[in-house]
Every structure is written in structure tokens, then in C-alpha cells.
Swiss-Prot record:
Low complexity bias spans: 8-22
UniProt feature, compositional bias: Polar residues: 23-33, 81-92, 302-329
GO biological processes: DNA-templated transcription; positive regulation of DNA-templated transcription; xylan catabolic process
Taxon lineage: Eukaryota, Fungi, Dikarya, Ascomycota, Pezizomycotina
Gene Ontology molecular function, alphabetical: DNA binding; DNA-binding transcription factor activity, RNA polymerase II-specific; zinc ion binding
A GO CC term attached to the entry: nucleus
Domain of life where this protein originates: Eukaryota
Protein name: Xylanolytic transcriptional activator xlnR
Record carries keyword Cytoplasm: no
Compositionally biased residues, Basic and acidic residues: 65-78, 570-586
Family stated for the protein in its record: Belongs to the xlnR/xlr1 family.
SUPFAM superfamilies cross-referenced by the UniProt entry: Zn2/Cys6 DNA-binding domain
InterPro entries listed in its UniProt record: Transcription_factor_dom_fun, XlnR/Xlr1, Zn2-C6_fun-type_DNA-bd_sf, Zn2Cys6_DnaBD
Amino acid sequence: MSTTSLQHFSHSYSPFPSSRSSNRMAQSQTSGLDTLAEGSQYALEQLQMSREAAGDGEATNSMGKPKDQYQIDNDNHHNNHSLPSFKNSSQRDPLVEARSTIRKNSASAPVRRRISRACDQCNQLRTKCDGQNPCAHCIEFGLTCEYARERKKRGKASKKDLAAAAAAATNPGQPNGSSGKEDAAMVGGHTSPDRRPTLNGRYDPAFEVPRNLNGSAQHSEASGMVGMQNSQHLPPHSQSSMGGGLEGLSLNGYNGLNDSSRPSMPVPELQSLHMLHNSHTNPRSPSSVLPHHRYNGGYNDSAYSLMNPQEPNSTSISHFRLGSSTENPPNSFLGLSPPAQSPGWLPLPSPSPANFPSFSMASFSTTLRYPVLHPVLPHIASIIPQSLACDLLDVYFTSSSSSHLSPQSPYVVGYIFRKQSFLHPTKPRVCTPGLLASMLWVAAQTSDAPFLTSPPSARGRVCQKLLELTIGLLRPLIHGPAPGETSPNYAANMVINGVALGGFGVSMDQLGAQSSATGAVDDVATYVHLATVISASEYKAASMRWWTAAWSLARELKLGRELPPNTPHSRPDAERDGDPDADLSKRHPPPLITSMGHGPGNTVINITEEEREERRRLWWLLYATDRHLALCYNRPLTLLDKECEGLLQPMNDDLWQAGDFATYRQAGPPVECTGHSMFGYFLPLMTILGEIVDLQQARNHPRFGLAFRNSAECEAQVLEIARQLDVYAQSLKEFETRYTSSLALGAAETEAAMEGSHLNHVSPSGRSSSTVESRVNESIVHTKMVVAYGTHIMHVLHILLAGKWDPINLLDDNDLWISSESFVAAMGHAVGAAEAASEILEYDPDLSFMPFFFGIYLLQGSFLLLLTADKLQGDASPSVVRACETIVRAHEACVVTLNTEYQRTFRKVMRSALAQVRGRLPEDFGEQQQRRREVLALYRWTGDGSGLAL
């Protein structure tokens, strides 16, 4: 096939009209709605008429030579032999003549200015787009402007299109002969170098790049397109379908694919890269089970059908051009749609340029700032940019204090993992995609990135997609629907290998010998992330499903037990743990810890001290939240003290992040304050709270509660818990003295003070005396804030020990408890808690230090003040009035930091009571009291009450 013939045929059939023939093509084209409404038969009629109109003027090729008459007749034969009425112009249908006349008469009509397609970003954000490339909106916000998403058609594919695809897949291509010219013309992604592609009639500046390919290069490239079939061997319906595909072909999708100056990559390379990608991802992620698809070269019913891996009959092409953009490098992402058996509750979006797997290839991708994200990149590419994912990982590990680690995000209640292990530039920790997706989801809740704040609905949409992705990657316990309500995909989503676990949607490889130790720990941490955010929302009752799954899996993995020592033949822990930056990928062997009861025998794998500490911290975090939620939702404990009496207590957070693994620590649940993190000051309080919860459950037992309340055993338990609270109070004083007086006295010895107290973990630079003094002062303030929070919760636990948790029972006072000595002691603790809250507001005005935990203790510490204000009204003491004012201020700060319904409700109740204390009685005083009672009745801590879980 000559180059001249190829160029001429490309001129006649290329979907990108040249500047010379663009006007004529615009005249012959109908509107986009007409093209979508008509079938391939109608599109073929348009093609025939445009060719006949161009027959007289275009009978010569670009070199001025007349076109071969045989070629013209042959073209007419190949394209029209299924339609006898179009063999020559004299036999045309009158309807076609009428349509042709209408098109010719409408040539002078004004061109429509309405754009036919918005860019991918504007489409996703539902923002008005000007149709340019790049568009004004993407330029303004620095977004990647692409037109690469699939153009969808209404309804299912026609039988003709499916038959054409089947024929294209079965017939081999012809490398030479006259059919090669037609093959070249049918390649929608190939354009002649002297033509300017247009975008729906508008010139696209993205295509204005130098093209230096000579004729021979174009010829070899066109002949290398294996998937384009010889039209002589296609059945008539296939010809009609492909002819119609030319007329209705969407050109938008080729902005980033059909640039002849961009590098090409053979499909074998892409397939090898795809396998490389699968080898680096978690074997349990959905993408790893997707088959290797061949890339479709036929048009079918979509301009993107060649990128649709789910097409049942597809042909392969030997070369593919990759588009590039300014923000997302040309790496990138080639057409993997969501699996066909995606769960019904996981509505993954249709393929956008970012729904495709990322290929780790130096020439096609920039350096990823945090390589730990590699397993999740293929899944999040359609949701957030790669740079934003790295920023969100930074947000997750951001500390609000430079002196001691304190998570800035309200949804990160405690650090389970080392920051350096995740953010290491070359040897990061190996993580499951589900854990990484959940971390990004948690960070996206509060990140101030422009991508999440403009428009205002962007954060909700991104967080929803990340949540669905996290659940899909986690494959959690799925409760089966009722009989007759099973969705079509339900059976496909249930990967069941055993009878015992099959009913809950859990396969044996998740908990058995096929799962990795760290993978199982990552799953528990993912459950924690999901449960924490949902607990802080208005769906508190729903969060218990996730907490229960986390507690159950932690118990099955025996996280509450210390692992046996490593085998002697392995490298000692001291040698491996001495280098915190060692190859972390080697710290996570694939087999599960069989010594915990999974798998044959009692062989013990080697596990590093970092992995052991991750297990401990995860257990203690679940242990603390179990007791905290038992108070919040009026429920019994799930994790028992007996299960973890031999488990070492978590180490100091600053030492943990620095990689300085301590060898000596106490075991069992702690009762003394030891540090600035939630494991240091909050975990001991939760140990004591667990005993109070057990005591309260025994008091409220429907059959044995009355006898227990009047027994000596109950009184002995109360005294023991009170003693433990006194021990904690003493440890709190010693903690304050140790971290305030010693730092203040040692401030002059700047270098020694900084080295001795491990306060330079944030930045090793800046060792001037002013910097050291500033950090010492910040450490002192941080210590005082921890002491204030610990003091407040300790006073609340004293109030809870009295057994009056329910606000309605307090207001009714049926047992006259308000006149007892126990009430007087509890009231003193209520005033003490309010004073501690005043100190908290001084050091932490927005209550951002521990917003997830603090709300319930602020609420329970306020019920007695509400009771006093309701009973005494204007006769209340000044200390009670000040305490009520402090509680109102604290609730207002809580509403700003972590807005929840019960805090908004109780703030209104306390404001109403405070107005009564100050003597401002409204006219409808009785109605307000009744309304206040109705509001408080929503939150009950009686025998069958559910607390905050509405």
C-alpha cells in the first residue's frame, strides 16, 4: 500500500477533519442528539451522502493525481453492498435527498455555541465548563483538565454492534492490499500529520504539537495496527456498524491518546507492567483478581470501547499512545474498569482516566513521595490526585504539638503505627490497600486541601468514594439479606471456603493460613478507622457493627497475648530493631502466626519488636474504646482484663516514634498516669472505668441487682475502685511535677534538656536557646493540659461510681438520693470537674486535644449541676452558677470542634437551666421544664437504655 493512497484515504475517512474540509463536514453532520438517536443505518446514510458530495471535488489525491477509479468503486462496494439503494447516486432514496437538501440549506445557519462535553474534572465536580483544553475552571484551581472519560450511550448495545465486535475478534487483519487503505481509514486514533483535529467542530489546541513523523513511519505505524480487520472479510452487518461508528464517533476521548509526537508503548509491555503491578499489590485486593484483558481495537458502540477490558469480544492492538498532563504524569492509567462482580454497595465510577491501574515505570511516572501508597494508587486514582494522597498521609501523622506527639485529626485517637515506617522514602512498611484507603479517608475528613473545599460538596463526595473503596478492599462481615431479597451480585461477592464462616461473608484465607500476620493487623486497624469516624457522627448505633468486628477479629488474632520469642536460628531482635530504617518490607513475612492456633503445628515465625508493639498498641486502643463506648451506649464490656493480664503496656509515644524500643515494661492493664499520649493518661482511666461499668451492670441486673446493691461485696468493690482513683490522682500529681518542674529547672541546660526529654522528634534543626526555651514552655503547657483532662475525667468517674447515670432518674429523685451524703460527695466532684474544665478551656480553648473521647465525660459531669439548677433555681451557690457557666462554654466549644447532636441538645438544656438560676423565669416555665425532660429522655442509662446510641 503506497503512502500516497494511505494519506488520501486518511483524508477521506479520518474522524478528525482537516482545515480544508472541516466546513463541509460540519454541514453534513447532524446534531449530537440526532446522532445518538439514530442507529448505525442512519449514520451510514450520512457517510454515503458526505462522500457523494465530496466525490466531484475530491477525486484527486493530495498530490494532484486522479484517484484510482477501481479504488473508488471498490470503496463504494465495500461500504454499500448491504444497501442496494445506495450503489449509485441516481438510485438514492427520496428521504435521503430531502435530508441532503436540508443540510445544504442549513449551511448558512449560525454555529451552535453550546459545548457538547465538559472536561472530566468539571463533570465530576458538577461545575460549568467552557469546553476548552485546558478549561478555565481547571486553570483557576490547578486541576488536570482531560477529556478521557467514556462517552456513554443510553440503553444496551445493539445486536449489530455486538456481532460486529465478534466478527472483528475472529477475522485476522490483512497487512497489505487495497484493504490496508480501508484499515488505515478505520483507525480512529490515527490522523494525518497535516490535519488539525477538532473537538466537536472546535479546534483543540491540545493537539497543536510538532509532528515529525515521515510517511514511512506513518505507513509502518498504520500497518502495525493488528486489530483493524479487512472489510472484505466482514459480514454486512459488521460493515454497517463500523461505518456508523465513524459518523457518531466521539473525538473527545482521543485528546490524550492520539498524539503522534507522544511515545508509544507496545501492548506486550503493558501486559507485563500490569502483571508487575499485580505482584506489588495485596493479593486480597479486588484488582489482583482481575484477569489480564486484551485492549479492544474495534469501535463497537463507544469511542472508548478499545479501552474497555470487560468487552467480551475484543481485539488487540500492538501500540498505544499515552497522553500526558501537567499534574498527573503520563503514567499512568490504562483502562481497568471496576470488576464485573463489584458489590451492590460499592458503586465504583465509570472509567475516568484515573480508574486505571498505575504502572511502575520510570519513564512514564514521576517519583512518588511516599512509596507506601503504591498498593492503593490504582484504586484511588479516579478519586483524588496522587499528590493529594501524599498530603493526606501527612495530615494523618500530623501532630498538633512539637513537644509531644498529639494527633491533630480528631479522628486519630492514638498512633498505632510509626510515622517513619509509613513515610520512609525507599523502604516503607508493607500495608494492605484497605488500611491505606482508610487512612486517607480519615485524613480527608478534616484536610483543608483546595481539592476538598471547592466546591463545598467536594469533601462529601470524595469521602463517600473513599469510604466505599475502603469497605470494598476490606471485605468486611456482610450480613446476608432476607430470602428472596438477595441481589444478583451477592453470591458472587461471597468468597466462601468454609461452612462456619461462610454465613458471615468471611473466607478462610482472611483468618487462616493464607493471610499474613500484618495483613490481619491491618484489617483490625482499618475497622478501627471506620468505627471511629462513624462513632463521631450521628450514626453512633451503626458504629457498633464496626467496633464489634474489630474486637472480634482482635480476639481471634489473640492480640491481647504476648507472642513467644523468635526462633533461635533467626537474626536477634536487638540486631534487627537497632536500625529503625531497615528494610521494613522484610519485616512482614507472608505466613500467618501459626502459634496462635492457625495452621498445623506450633511453629513460630520471626516477628520484629515493631510488629509486636503494633499488636500491643492496637489491643490497648480497642481495650480503651471498649470501656469508653460501654459508658456511651450503656452496654457491658467486650474485652476482659483477664485476656490481657500478661500483655506488656504500650511504650512511650516519643520513644516509639523514635524507634527506641524499651525492653522493660509492666504487664497488664495500667492504673497510673505515665505519659502524654492517650495510652499514658487515658488508658489507666479506662481501666478503672471498666470496673465501674461491671459494677453498674451488676447493680442493674434484673434478677440479682437488688441483692447485690445491698451486699457487702458491692461496698467492697466501691471502696477498691475509689482507692484506684486515688492512686491515679497521686500519679497525676507526680507526672505533673516530673514534666514541669524538671523542665523548668533544666531550661538553662538547653542541649542536655532537649536530648534528655526526647523533645526534638519533630525537627532536629533549630537548637538555639530561644527554640529550646520555646519547646520547653510548650512541653510544660502540654503537660498541664494533660493533667487538666485527666483530673476532669477522674472527677467524673467518682460521680459515676455513685451509680446515678440517668438524667431522668436524677430529676425524679424517687429514692431521695439528693439528701444523702453520697450526693454531697458526688456534687463536690461535679464542681471539681467543672473547675478542671475551666483549666482545659484555658490551655485548649477549642477542646481539640481529645474531642472524640471528651464529650461523654463532659455530659455525665454536668447532670448533677443540671439537677442542682433545676431544684434550687435562684438559691444555688455561686460555685454552682460558675460551674454551670463553664459547662455551657465547654459544650459550645465541643460543638465547634466535633459537632454532634447530643452536645447541641444539652447545651440548650444547660442554657435554659442557667437562665433559671439567674432568676430569669419565662412565662411558659412549666412547658420549658417539660420540653427539657423530653429532650433528656432521649438519652437513657437505665437497664434497657442505649445512652447516646439513638
